Regions:
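C-terminal transmembrane-helix exit sites in multi-pass transporters
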Residues: 27, 84, 103-125, 256-284
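C-terminal-most transmembrane helix of multi-pass membrane proteins
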Residues: 40, 44, 139-140, 245, ...
Length: 318
């Protein structure tokens, strides 16, 4: 099931770029932060509304641990997506998708630090492969030691996605029901995104203009149904059944789907909406960098990790 979540998230990368292109056609003076806020707010309002209709009474009888987890997941996710979506406007969909996977390195290292235990050799080898892949994919300049804005923001977003995965791994949340947690997460994310609209909008009167565009609404609906409701429901339901390290590395499949879809979806989106978003191509950097990151995931799956005990409440609060 987590593979299906990766398919949906892979679709989100070309979709988000398409929404940004359509937004700029409608409101050319918009900042990238305002564009990001306008992507996120309707996405999570729709997701919360659909879930509340589909699962009536989902929020009834929520326990304190479910509330804490829902709010925590929302905060990690919304901050991560703000940086990821803004960064995606300054780099390609494929590059963003692969760089997001830096949490594949951070999760085992973080768990080792918290538990004062060294990860097995296979984790270190995989980490080196991912680091090399990131350097190649981002065209890292070793002389100036600089990355572009899009790449930096994407790497920052990965820190928050790591926090989201680790929160699902906590033992004090093991008995939580995934549906109420997911619905609350969507509501908190929607509220945060609306605050961001208020802060970044040149004029609030500009916002309704977006809803006059059939392509913008269509892209947003697809992002909501597949990449939000579908992907997050699957993640919150199935990811707690495996270790955080295994989950982080399984999610390395996401950029493979994103890169594949970025080869043909931009042209289809452009034809429908009337903007110029060219199909991406398989460059040497993408093949080598993406291949190294994918190899790290394959290595972990071929040689499975010993299952670590999830973080206890005391460990999580340290």
């Amino acid at each position: 099931m987590l593979v299906l979540a990766n398919v949906f998230w892979g679709l989100s990368f070309p979709l988000i770029k398409a929404i940004a292109f359509e937004h700029l056609q409608l409101l050319p003076a918009s900042s990238s932060w305002f564009i990001t806020a306008c992507m996120l707010a309707p996405r999570f309002v729709l997701a919360a509304a659909i879930m509340l209709v589909w699962r009536r009474g989902a929020l009834r009888g929520m326990t304190p641990p479910e509330i804490r987890q829902g709010v925590g997941l929302a905060l990690f996710a919304i901050v991560g997506m703000v940086f990821q979506n803004d960064g995606l406007q300054y780099t390609s969909a494929s590059t963003s998708a692969f760089l997001t996977q830096i949490y594949a390195i951070l999760i085992p290292l973080w768990l080792a630090l918290r538990r004062r235990r060294l990860p097995p050799a296979v984790v270190w080898i995989s980490c080196l492969l991912v680091l090399a892949g990131v350097a190649v994919l981002a065209r890292f300049d070793w002389r100036d030691l600089k990355l572009g804005r899009g790449e930096i923001e994407t790497l920052v977003s990965s820190l928050f996605f790591m926090g989201q995965i680790l929160m699902l791994d906590r033992t004090d949340f093991a008995s939580n029901r995934p549906v109420p947690v997911t619905v609350l997460m969507f509501i908190v994310e929607a509220a945060a995104a609306f605050v961001m609209i208020g802060v970044t909008a040149p004029r609030l009167a500009d916002v309704p203009v977006l809803f006059t565009s059939v392509p913008w609404v269509g892209f947003t609906m697809a992002l909501t149904l597949f990449c939000t409701i579908g992907a997050f429901t699957i993640m919150n339901t199935w990811q707690p059944r495996i270790t955080a390290t295994e989950a982080g590395l399984i999610y390395c499949l996401e950029p493979l789907f994103a890169s594949f879809m970025a080869l043909f979806l931009p042209g289809l989106f452009s034809h429908w909406a009337g903007f110029a978003y060219p199909n991406e191509t398989l460059t040497a950097n993408l093949l080598v960098g993406g291949g190294l990151i994918t190899a790290a995931n394959v290595l972990i799956q071929v040689k499975p990790l010993p299952r670590l005990t999830p973080l206890t409440p005391a460990e999580a609060r340290r």
